[in-house]
Amino acid sequence: MVENIALLPEFAAQYPFLWGSFLFLSGLAFGSFFNVVIHRLPLMMEQAEGINLCFPASFCPQCREPIAWRDNIPLLGFLFLKGRSRCCGQPISPRYPLMELATGALFVLAGYLMAPGVPLLGGLILLSLLLILAAIDAQTQLLPDGLTLPLMWAGLLFNLSATYVPLAEAVVGAMAGYLSLWSVYWVFRLLSGKEALGYGDFKLLAALGAWLGWQALPQTLLLASPAA
């Protein structure tokens, strides 16, 4: 198994089209699962009865009828159904194919920017969780602890061996990320009596600090500010 993984960089270099195709198809499959997380995790947070990430099987959000496996094929199912549910004829949200395409594109981009191995694995995890968090935030204005905290710990875990930054920088980055937004939150609240940020924002910046280190926090805040 380890020997096969060690051969991946050579395979990617010799067969870039096959490598890119593998990454794209993998991204489509993972993107399909990410849609499940985006739809169900907020329901689970509301303690909806009988719903978790695995049960029940995929169902129509409008009429809650089970979705046949052939209609659940990433991207193709949406195209075959022409964007409408087979069971009730209601429009299928374009978020589903867009999430699958976005995940596929990000997997390919990461695969060509990073050599196969631990850095690529970490990069895919980081990009995937950020994509899910962005979709949930846009839908519900929530950043669930069930995603932000594992993202932070994963960043520290990958940086135990300085995969992206030295561990000390990652730890300081996590602390600085949290405390910087926490300070802004309380200063703004004391001055205006209003809340401009949520605790999920603090934890997300802490997670990014754990992955990228404290030195990347100013650039991260600058890039994130237009979406705030």
From Swiss-Prot:
<dbReference type="InterPro" id="IPR050882">
    <property type="entry name" value="Prepilin_peptidase/N-MTase"/>
</dbReference>
<comment type="function">
    <text>Plays an essential role in type IV pili and type II pseudopili formation by proteolytically removing the leader sequence from substrate proteins and subsequently monomethylating the alpha-amino group of the newly exposed N-terminal phenylalanine.</text>
</comment>
<dbReference type="InterPro" id="IPR000045">
    <property type="entry name" value="Prepilin_IV_endopep_pep"/>
</dbReference>
<keyword id="KW-0949">S-adenosyl-L-methionine</keyword>
<keyword id="KW-0472">Membrane</keyword>
<keyword id="KW-0489">Methyltransferase</keyword>
<keyword id="KW-0997">Cell inner membrane</keyword>
<feature type="transmembrane region" description="Helical">
    <location>
        <begin position="18"/>
        <end position="38"/>
    </location>
</feature>
<keyword id="KW-0645">Protease</keyword>
<feature type="transmembrane region" description="Helical">
    <location>
        <begin position="147"/>
        <end position="167"/>
    </location>
</feature>
<feature type="transmembrane region" description="Helical">
    <location>
        <begin position="204"/>
        <end position="224"/>
    </location>
</feature>
<feature type="transmembrane region" description="Helical">
    <location>
        <begin position="116"/>
        <end position="136"/>
    </location>
</feature>
<dbReference type="InterPro" id="IPR014032">
    <property type="entry name" value="Peptidase_A24A_bac"/>
</dbReference>
<protein>
    <recommendedName>
        <fullName>Prepilin leader peptidase/N-methyltransferase</fullName>
        <ecNumber>3.4.23.43</ecNumber>
        <ecNumber>2.1.1.-</ecNumber>
    </recommendedName>
</protein>
<keyword id="KW-1133">Transmembrane helix</keyword>
<comment type="similarity">
    <text>Belongs to the peptidase A24 family.</text>
</comment>
<dbReference type="Pfam" id="PF01478">
    <property type="entry name" value="Peptidase_A24"/>
</dbReference>
<feature type="transmembrane region" description="Helical">
    <location>
        <begin position="95"/>
        <end position="115"/>
    </location>
</feature>
<dbReference type="Pfam" id="PF06750">
    <property type="entry name" value="A24_N_bact"/>
</dbReference>
<keyword id="KW-0808">Transferase</keyword>
<keyword id="KW-0378">Hydrolase</keyword>
<keyword id="KW-0511">Multifunctional enzyme</keyword>
<dbReference type="GO" id="GO:0008168">
    <property type="term" value="F:methyltransferase activity"/>
</dbReference>
<dbReference type="GO" id="GO:0004190">
    <property type="term" value="F:aspartic-type endopeptidase activity"/>
</dbReference>
<dbReference type="InterPro" id="IPR010627">
    <property type="entry name" value="Prepilin_pept_A24_N"/>
</dbReference>
<keyword id="KW-0812">Transmembrane</keyword>
<dbReference type="GO" id="GO:0005886">
    <property type="term" value="C:plasma membrane"/>
</dbReference>
<dbReference type="GO" id="GO:0006465">
    <property type="term" value="P:signal peptide processing"/>
</dbReference>
<dbReference type="GO" id="GO:0032259">
    <property type="term" value="P:methylation"/>
</dbReference>
<keyword id="KW-1003">Cell membrane</keyword>
<feature type="transmembrane region" description="Helical">
    <location>
        <begin position="168"/>
        <end position="188"/>
    </location>
</feature>
